[in-house]
């Protein structure tokens, strides 16, 4: 729950469980952040439930212990109590519905994202499009890490790290990697759509409602987990 350079937040949600590779990654990242920025480490949000699986609220992902939310609120050197970690909130970094960063966004935020994305264990990172465009404009030298920063809805209070499947875990299937290149043009297109939304398509078909989650739709391993409870 607490280390020298990290703290898990919102413990009452019981979503601070991850695979060993995820725990190692978060601890490693927190040390790097404390060393290379003015932050004292990182605040860790949701990872997964104790036995994985879908959650009742908040996420469609975070089901197999390889996803983690990292708050964009800079960590201080103060150790927060459990009660404080329930009440303190992260802060939004977006302006104009995510088209731009706001005045709270700093060079240290960019460094944290660079450190997070540069790790070989990372598959992709989700962040609001305005932040990606800001980093595209300011980054010089090695830009390869930008490829892993993917623009996505929300994600302006935290960024979402998704790790690659651990070696030897046959039941885990990696997503296709992000397209080649730094992905900056794609992020710019996201911003353009925010600032100048396309008109609604009068011929668009209504979205189908999401199918309910049933045990039959979950991986076979879930049956064994639930049977053991």
Regions found by a protein language model. Give the residues of each.
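Extracytoplasmic
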Residues: 37-39, 63-68, 156-158
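Short, solvent-exposed beta-strand-terminating loops
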Residues: 72-82
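Catalytic cores and adjacent binding grooves of peptidoglycan-active enzymes
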Residues: 80-229
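Short secondary-structure capping micro-motifs at structural edges
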Residues: 55-59, 111-112
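Short, surface-exposed glycine/acidic/tryptophan-bearing loops
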Residues: 57-74
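Short, functionally critical alpha-helical segments immediately adjacent to catalytic or ligand/cofactor-binding
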Residues: 44-48, 67, 161
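Extended, low-complexity, intrinsically disordered C-terminal regulatory tails
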Residues: 25-57, 124-148
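Active-site acidic/histidine clusters and adjacent loop/turn architecture
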Residues: 1-44, 105-115, 119-122
